[in-house]
Amino acid sequence: MEELLSKVKQNLILNHNEDDVLLSGFITAAISYAESYQKKPDGYYKENPMHPTTEQAVIMLSSHFYESRDGSTGGFFADKVEASQQVWHVVNMLLRLNRDVVI
């Protein structure tokens, strides 16, 4: 989790530790979303390596959660609300690359 936290902070250009607990919660939520979307069991990425495309999706989604933490479309998304939808589109596309097929 520490490595992912560092990567999310780099993505957000954060140089302080004040929001580490908050970010860790967002990372946990993003990983849970990835596991669910990819049809993997809960906790899968605690025991198995994360593919780089899945990791990028988790970084993007965690960053999106942080930037949108007040529930509005403020900050980065204030001028273009559809930019938020684009984040979800890209995240889902990246996660699809490592999705388990359930028959």
What residue ranges belong to the model's regions?
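Divalent metal-cofactor coordination and adjacent catalytic microenvironments
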Residues: M1-I103
